[in-house]
């Protein structure tokens, strides 16, 4: 699973995901992509699960790029613990995904195969997504 090698701080503020993505909104590597439509936090496990769904459906042909990285430590407190006494310990890593952000890209495969692979990946993610191509959204290639 993806996680940073080292960070400046062990814990981070929860924060909010305001506005749209400033960068990473266009296809840079592949011919097809999966774009986020709503703001949400995506965990490293969810990213890995979606990646596996894509690579398994493509049967190792073509190339897959992951355009998001889980760099936010999410801390939780144990069950049935009283309020106070500090923040919990970091449990997992997540990526803040803004609307318009390209999350995955694929190249070297036919349109229908890429579309089905991204449908399978989207089912693994907690976020509404849209399939896009070099020419535009929806798959008019």
Curated annotation (Swiss-Prot):
The keyword DNA damage does not apply. GO terms for biological process: translation. Coiled coil: none annotated. The keyword Ribonucleoprotein applies. PROSITE patterns: RIBOSOMAL_L16_1, RIBOSOMAL_L16_2. Keywords: Ribonucleoprotein, Ribosomal protein, RNA-binding, rRNA-binding, tRNA-binding. Binds 23S rRNA and is also seen to make contacts with the A and possibly P site tRNAs. Belongs to the universal ribosomal protein uL16 family. Part of the 50S ribosomal subunit. This is Large ribosomal subunit protein uL16. It comes from Rhodospirillum centenum (strain ATCC 51521 / SW).
């Amino acid at each position: 699973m993806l996680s940073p090698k080292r960070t400046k701080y062990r814990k981070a503020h929860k924060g909010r995901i305001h506005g749209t993505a400033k960068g990473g909104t266009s296809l840079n590597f592949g011919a097809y992509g999966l774009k986020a439509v709503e703001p949400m936090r995506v965990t490293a496990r969810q990213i890995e699960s979606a990646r596996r769904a894509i690579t398994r459906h493509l049967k190792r042909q073509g190339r897959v790029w992951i355009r998001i990285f889980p760099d936010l430590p999410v801390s939780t407190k144990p069950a049935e613990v009283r309020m106070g006494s500090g923040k919990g310990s970091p449990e997992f890593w997540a990526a803040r995904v803004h609307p318009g952000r390209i999350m995955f890209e694929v190249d070297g495969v036919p349109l229908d195969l890429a579309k089905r692979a991204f449908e399978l990946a989207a089912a693994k993610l907690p976020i509404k997504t849209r399939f896009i191509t070099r020419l535009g959204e929806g798959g008019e290639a």
